[in-house]
């Protein structure tokens, strides 16, 4: 599974690079960047992709394979992922939501990118951290597509009890297999089931446990009225892992946000979703 977290995936029509950006003392996050080989496409402003909790690149390969030939793409992996380089003992507070937006801002600063010129695409935790960062003035944007954002991270009672207990490392493999089984049961879409299984099996479980303990306490602010980034919230009714009513509540709270419904969560990971992405960006004058 190490190959999931290293190397710059080479995609047709673009030059690829991988690098790490120090976002806090002893913590660096992995960044992938593609620049189209076509000079006209390469001159466009970048789209920045922030994937979800524990998400691996392979889940996004179908979309990015097409997208990287059209414009520069920057793909930022958040610090809970196995790819991040953390050279000290990790703590629960390292993975609190408040850090993630500043991490993304640090990456843009390193690359010399003004967040106000960015077209964002994000998913799940990636979408949640951007909403919080927009509200707090940490990041701006020209446009933002938010796939299945989480206003909170609601765990079942048994999981909340388990997360409060010390979990010995020798239990980790069994716990991971159990988690994969549970996700398989809860997920209606086959493509989504495959992606989650692959992502879960590729994780550093210690980091994911600490991240879960941080996320279980998190609630998106009720007041999102300070957001000035034009936002489209994307969702699929077949996505049983993200509460549609909570997603709709986010749409209502973000000024002038629009809802974009897609056929499935898997569709949002495929090249076909570029139709919806580019339609929204065109509608706001991009």
Positions of predicted regions on the chain:
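Conserved alpha/beta-hydrolase catalytic His-Asp/Glu region
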Residues: 155-157, 172-225
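Alpha/beta-hydrolase fold catalytic core
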Residues: 1-47, 70-71, 280-286
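Catalytic active-site module of serine/aspartate enzymes centered on a nucleophile-bearing elbow/loop
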Residues: 256-286
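Conserved alpha/beta-hydrolase "acid-adjacent" motif
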Residues: 240-246
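Conserved HGGG/HGGXW glycine-rich cap/lid loop of the alpha/beta-hydrolase fold
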Residues: 27-86
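Flexible "cap/lid" loop of the alpha/beta hydrolase fold
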Residues: 131, 135, 141-170
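Active-site loop/oxyanion-hole signature of alpha/beta-hydrolase fold enzymes
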Residues: 75-121
């Amino acid at each position: 599974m190490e190959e999931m977290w290293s190397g710059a995936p080479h995609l047709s029509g673009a030059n690829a690079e991988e690098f790490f950006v120090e976002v806090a003392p002893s913590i660096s996050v992995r960044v992938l960047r593609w620049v189209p080989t076509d000079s006209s496409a390469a001159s466009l402003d970048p789209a920045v992709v922030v994937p979800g909790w524990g998400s691996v690149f392979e889940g996004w390969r179908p979309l990015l394979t097409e997208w990287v030939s059209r414009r520069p793409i920057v793909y930022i992996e958040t610090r809970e992922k196995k790819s991040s380089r953390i050279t000290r003992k990790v703590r629960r507070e390292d993975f609190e939501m408040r850090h993630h937006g500043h991490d993304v801002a640090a990456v843009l600063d390193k690359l010399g990118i003004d967040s106000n010129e960015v077209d964002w695409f994000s998913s799940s935790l990636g979408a949640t951290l951007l909403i919080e960062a927009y509200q707090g003035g940490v990041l701006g944007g020209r446009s933002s597509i938010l796939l299945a954002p989480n206003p909170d991270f609601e765990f079942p009672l048994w999981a909340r009890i388990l997360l409060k207990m010390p979990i010995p490392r020798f239990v980790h493999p069994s716990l991971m297999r159990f988690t994969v089984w549970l996700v398989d049961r809860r997920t209606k879409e086959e493509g989504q089931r495959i992606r989650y299984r692959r992502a879960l099996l590729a994780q550093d479980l210690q980091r994911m446990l600490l991240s879960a303990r941080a996320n279980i306490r998190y609630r998106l602010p009720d007041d999102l009225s300070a957001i000035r980034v034009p936002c489209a919230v994307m969702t699929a009714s077949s996505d049983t892992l993200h509460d549609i009513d909570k997603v709709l509540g986010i749409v209502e709270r973000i000024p002038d946000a629009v809802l974009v419904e897609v056929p499935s969560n898997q569709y949002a990971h495929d090249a076909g979703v570029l139709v919806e992405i580019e339609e929204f960006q065109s509608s706001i004058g991009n």
